């Protein structure tokens, strides 16, 4: 059994917030000294890392309703100039889903017959019954997104749309631009 470190020293907590992120920890949990954990209650506060990055919209999945954007797929250019998938945005209001689809329709990649090009994604243990196919977009739309952490070349969790960036060129959205947490050995975080 391992216990997480704890402190009442704000300076030390701030240091841990930065230092331990590289071990894969999302952030810090704060609570009153006399507060016990109660399942289903929200008496503790979790402070997570938040960053922003500019990414290229590379495709979208149609919402389960059959229209509108279900999720917007994102990519970044690697050092070899390849546009690689890095994650997606899926939290849109119904109105935004429909408006976004209208905006994206002219950007659809089309095959020789004029049909939209589909991006097939292998099914995983989480999505075995869902159609994971997406419609490919011309890599021209840049969006600024908020994220908490990048693991390898993927956003660790779903990201949030901050704004569209018509002032940015898609080719300027590089994987190397994304801030990463310095590596840290998790065994240094846990105590016996």
Question: Residue locations for each model-derived region?
Answer:
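Catalytic cores of nucleic-acid ligases and guanylyltransferases
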Residues: 1-192
């Amino acid at each position: 059994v391992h216990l997480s470190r704890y402190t009442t020293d704000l300076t030390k907590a701030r240091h841990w917030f930065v230092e331990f992120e590289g071990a894969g920890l999302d952030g810090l949990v704060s609570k009153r000294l006399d507060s016990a954990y109660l399942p289903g209650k929200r008496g503790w506060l979790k402070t997570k890392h938040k960053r922003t990055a500019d990414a290229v919209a590379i495709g979208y999945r149609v919402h389960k309703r059959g229209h509108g954007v279900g999720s917007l797929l994102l990519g970044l250019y690697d050092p070899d100039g390849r546009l690689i998938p890095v994650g997606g945005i899926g939290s849109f209001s119904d109105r935004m889903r429909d408006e976004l689809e209208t905006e994206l329709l002219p950007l659809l990649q089309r095959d020789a017959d004029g049909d939209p090009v589909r991006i097939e994604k292998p099914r995983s243990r989480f999505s075995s019954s869902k159609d994971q196919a997406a419609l490919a977009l011309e890599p021209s739309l840049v969006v600024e997104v908020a994220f908490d952490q990048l693991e390898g070349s993927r956003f660790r969790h779903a990201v949030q749309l901050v704004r569209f960036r018509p002032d940015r060129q898609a080719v300027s959205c590089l994987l190397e631009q994304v801030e990463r947490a310095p590596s840290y050995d998790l065994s240094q975080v846990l105590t016996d």
